Amino acid sequence: MAAGGGGGGVSRAALARPPIHRGTSAPGGAIAAAGGDGDGDEASRLLGRAQPREAPYLIPRPDGDLAVPDDLQYATLDLTGDPVAVGAGSYGSVLVYGSVAVKTLRAGFGHEAVMTLLAAEEARSAGVRGVVRLMGLSAPLRQLMFPAYEMDMDAYRRSLTARPGHVVHALGRVFTELGRALVFLNGRGLSHLDVKGGNIFVRTCGNMVVTAVIGDFSLMALNSRSALADPRFRLARRKALKITSLARSPPTGVLLGHARDRPTRVLMDFINGRPPPPGPLPYEVGLAIDLCALGHVLLDVALGLRPQRGQALTREYAVEVLARRCVLFAALLPPGSGPSAEALAGDILEEELAAGFREGVASSRPGNQPPRTVAPLLELVARFCGEDGGARFAELAA
């Protein structure tokens, strides 16, 4: 299972676990389960609710603050059954109890809780699919609770041995839905900034994806379309959370990520030493980052590629990324989808870096041609990663 809030996936063999039998206690009664697209139905039943949550996650107050409903909060956790560990790292850990995933944070609880509440409320109020639903939170325990999923998209990619027509059709459907969800969130002032296979959670039927949602809002930031001033998010027992500086001004490292899945213009600004503009993250930049990253996840799934991460982020590495992208996109995507190598070489200000780029283009090889069956997925990749910053897809998704 994969946790809706991040933490990676486990093999199908780990799914043979007893279901949980009871929920947890909360200041305002039993915890309320949230769902959408069926992602919380089973968890809702196990936690004592017949239907997924329809009530707001945030309630506006006259003083401008936002109150978190009592029935979404809990002070103690009492889920029976053997938990399955599906992720651990510097952020904390994720345990799955049957149909429920519990993410316990060592640090950053306030930021992630606020961003998760905002994303969940926007998606709930608009009926948007493709965004994981929050089931509960606990400030004392530094926990967030989500529906558990079968695996993440990276695990699904590894499980595929072939990509027949029905698999391609299902992937096109769920990735289009994920793209629309990201367009929606960015339009509401929320840029995810950490879209990757490990943060997309899926349920399958055989080798076909049935449901996919984006989760893990630990790096989410407000963009220039956000109308939020400086509200407090009021919890039970007079506790409150606030929007952090990370949400208002994401650092350069977050914007650049692992470089490989970032928009060409973001990488070019880094290569040429241009700092991010002052003020909030521009909406167009946040949207382009999210859609370009989603496109690279789809590219990896369509071609069975293993994403390369962990390289030191230098200008030389960014040049290498762009050189490989020019060659790969020219070979795989529809004409005009990728960046022009000649134009990019002229845009690089330092001659030494420009020369390195030209050498990288000359030495890169696109690899084997993909099967024709995945052509519809590559067309969708082109829309996500196009040089227009994803604007074409955003127009279609509006």
From Swiss-Prot:
EC number from the UniProt entry: 2.7.11.1
TM helices/strands, residue ranges: none
GO CC annotation terms, alphabetical: host cell endoplasmic reticulum; host cell nucleus; viral tegument
InterPro entries listed in its UniProt record: Kinase-like_dom_sf (IPR011009), Prot_kinase_dom (IPR000719), Ser/Thr_kinase_AS (IPR008271)
Active-site residue numbers: 194 (proton acceptor)
Protein residues bound to ATP: 86-94, 103
Post-translational modification summary for this protein: Autophosphorylated.
Disulfide-linked positions: none
Name assigned to this protein: Serine/threonine-protein kinase UL13
UniProt function note: Multifunctional serine/threonine kinase that plays a role in several processes including egress of virus particles from the nucleus, modulation of the actin cytoskeleton and regulation of viral and cellular gene expression. Regulates the nuclear localization of viral envelopment factors UL34 and UL31, by phosphorylating the US3 kinase, indicating a role in nuclear egress. Disrupts host nuclear lamins, including LMNA and LMNB1. Phosphorylates the viral Fc receptor composed of glycoproteins E (gE) and I (gI).
